[in-house]
A protein has these predicted regions:
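Long, contiguous binding/interaction regions
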Residues: 1-194
């Protein structure tokens, strides 16, 4: 069966495909389930501390995006949410913070990279010019993932945390990637609260 060209998918090594789409409010339960499946180490690397449960206010904020200052892409395996890449900025600013989390069973298979590349494209299309990632200094996998973006970067460190600033103001996106980013933004904005 040929993949639908209007659907965004990430192929896995075993031949299955993950559907990529913007997060929606009705993903709340699936997001909580993903968090429950994460190892303590994955949670620590994502949130910089112990966080056994997501607070309802966080779930609400994480699943309600506006396609402008707040946006998130999810990777779905059937009805299971298996990865999230998000940015969150402030109104009137051209920068945003990013975060990525991938189900432990799918780490190191290119899912995080594929989602992050798409998130960067969406951020550029949304008019952002800088993305910032705060990463624990010992999180070599995330630091390596950010280096794969092939965009100008600057790093700052306070010893425990490395902040990677990614410059998005460079070259224009290829047409196919720009169109994919526009589709994701349009889908997110169509379900955004007024």
């Amino acid at each position: 069966m040929e993949p639908d060209v209007n659907r965004d998918q990430i192929p896995l090594r075993d031949g299955t495909r993950l559907e990529v789409r913007p997060i929606r409010p009705d993903d709340a339960d699936a997001l909580v389930a993903l968090h429950a499946r994460l190892s303590a180490d994955s949670i620590y690397r994502r949130y910089f501390g112990v966080r056994p449960h997501l607070a309802p206010a966080d779930v609400d904020r994480f699943t309600r995006v506006d396609g402008r200052t707040r946006f998130a892409l999810v990777a779905m395996r059937g009805t299971d949410l298996v990865a999230v890449a998000r940015y969150e900025g402030r109104a009137g600013h051209s920068s945003a913070e990013i975060a990525v989390v991938v189900d432990d069973t799918l780490q190191h298979q290119g899912v995080g990279r594929s989602l992050l590349e798409r998130l960067v494209d969406v951020a550029r299309e949304a008019g952002l010019d800088t993305l910032a990632a705060d990463v624990l200094a010992g999180n070599a996998a995330m630091l390596a993932l950010l280096r794969t973006l092939d965009l100008p970067q600057r790093t700052e460190s306070d010893g425990d945390t490395v902040t990677v600033l990614v410059d998005l103001s460079g070259t224009a996106l290829p047409a196919a990637r720009r169109e994919r980013a526009r589709r994701h933004l349009a889908r997110a904005r169509s379900v955004a609260p007024p």
